[in-house]
Amino acid sequence: MRSSSLAWALGLVALANAQGSPTQWYDSITGVTFSRFYQQDTDASWGYIFPSASGGQAPDEFIGLFQGPASAGWIGNSLGGSMRNNPLLVGWVDGSTPRISARWATDYAPPSIYSGPRLTILGSSGTNGNIQRIVYRCQNCTRWTGGAGGIPTTGSAVFGWAFHSTTKPLTPSDPSSGLYRHSHAAQYGFDIGNARTTLYDYYLQQLTNAPPLSGGAPTQPPTQQPPTTTAPPPPPPSSTFVSCPGAPQPRYQMNVANGFRVAPVLGGLTMPRGITLDTRGNLLVVERGRGLTGHTLDANGCVTSSKVVIQDTQINHGIDVHPSGRRIIASSGDIAWSWDYDPATMTATNRRTLVTGMNNFYHFTRTVHISRKYPNLFALNVGSDGNIDVPTRQQNSGRAQIRVFDYDQLPQNGVPFVSQYGRVLGYGLRNDVGITEDRAGNIHSIENSLDNAYRMVNGQRRDIHTNNPAEKVYNLGDPSNPRAIFGGYPDCYTVWEPSDFTDSPKQPGDWFTQDNSGQYTDAWCNANAVKPTLLLPPHTAPLDMKFGLGNDTNLYVALHGSWNRQPPQGYKVVVVPGQYSASGEWSPTAPLAQSRTAWSDLLTNRNENQCSGFGNANCFRPVGLVWSADGQNLYVSSDTSGEVFIIKRMSGPIVQPPITQPPITTSPPTPTTPPVVQPPTTVAPPQASQTLWGQCGGQGWTGPTLCPANSVCRESNQWYSQCVPA
């Protein structure tokens, strides 16, 4: 036993050597920001998020992250810096299953199971073949008896880290398994205050709802052809959902794609427009002419109760909830306001003016989007003041553009839309009502394009408006670094139907001007305007779009329909296949020129030809979209019919709940308790030869001593040698 304790002790000597400090790190897998310590030699990370402190007190919990190479054996930490008399957390991935447990050591010897902390494994844990990660919630974790005594509310703290580069625990399927001694260990300090955030509850929800990390090919998007002709058979239903009790029957007959069901959840509303969910899963609906209403939902996603959250007839479209859940922003045609919000009671108080001076009488709806990556930033759109609004060639017109504002920098009484506080994300965007954000934090917008389009050919005005121009999606980029992207309006439009152009060859996605002469020509547009990433059919009037959650990488678009086309088209929700880059940036699967067939119907009216862009429209007209947190339910508002629908994915949720391990009941060891694991000096690892960073020698070592190619066995001390790059 003496040699065992001494080996663990000398292995922890490195804890006296600080190895840098954590920094703020954006996790592109989940969109969550951690305070992360990164250890370059092992390519491993330890991340932390702590809840904010109120009155000098903070909840006794935190969110943690272990991440390292898939080949690593285990990753661990000491919450008090040193190994002895402080909680030790150890995690690893067993096949594809993440494991974690709490340990305690009173001596430099193999630690025993510790029953104090309550550990819950959260989403995005697992392995993809390259990395393994364990994201966890640690409750009852910041105060203990002995050692450091706890994690301070503010100021500096010292944490320890430990890592085994190759060998899993003795019984990987058992969270309580004995461990081989670490191959690396050290200590670092950081300011706990920098790791505390008011977004803790939001981040916890995001991580709880995140899918497991897994390898293999990504799930294929739906076929690009309409599901009525080419979609595969629907999966077996995992739900018996048919309709919501007490909800009205739909006003119009509808078709829904295979694998989904649709039913109303609300009816008789006053022009429902923008919709969203708060952090407790309540449905918020802007009813034009009434205000903001809130609706609690049951386990099936059906409404159980409703109330008025904000009584205000000025609010007409835009609504968003801050990621913290404690603030909402909504807008009239002229002013954007914020309210303090309590999701537990669905109450809004303390209205504050944020942005003014947005009024025009042509396009009078304003969309609000609060960045998920940068929650202090919010975007607002202002459409053109006319079908063709010539002054919008200039950014300072304050129309046909989207601007970004920093909430934390705004004066108490608000600012004009065209003030220096509003940075231009994009301009030359005729009326981009739909705004959304991808997993990299980039903002995408979708445009309602020109009515009554024509083309001058040999001095003759030729009507091309039935099938041109296309509606389109722009990637406007990072809202923290606005680039003032120019979308081409009021001169440049996008070809949908090339055969309408007899004076020059065209393909879908090409630029055209109505009068291809003078300064603003097709060539000028090619040289000066940024092309969209995606096209949709003309006069479908897209009003909202949302990306799928989890492994669903599609884009979902609400097409409101327009008065400016016969026969009518739109009046539906469509799906566009896409993919994410390694950084989380979304792009459509099909190239721009193939956009005409790169979408399929999700929800349609039974007879689109009876729809109208006037009055009650004779059909439902989709406006707003929002997904439930588990990715199973898509809510759709329809203004002219006064309804909100639920489109339910019958295969079930696609964002899985967290894996919660059973509580550990073993008591903490006393000083006389013998170690529960035999030391590694008497148990040989299973490998015949060692891997990079693995132990290859040392006094009493009986394991593999042969290192892989291009590495050597280097002595760290009398008891430990390691395979390192040559």
UniProtKB/Swiss-Prot annotation:
Domain of life: Eukaryota
One of the GO biological process terms: carbohydrate metabolic process
Any one GO CC term of the record: extracellular region
Cellular localization per UniProt: Secreted
pH relationship of activity: Optimum pH is 6.5 for phenazine methosulfate reduction and 8.5 for cytochrome c reduction.
Pfam families linked: CBM_1, CDH-cyt, TrAA12
Annotated protein name in UniProt: Pyrroloquinoline quinone-dependent pyranose dehydrogenase
Organism name: Coprinopsis cinerea (strain Okayama-7 / 130 / ATCC MYA-4618 / FGSC 9003) (Inky cap fungus)
Designated gene of the protein: PDH
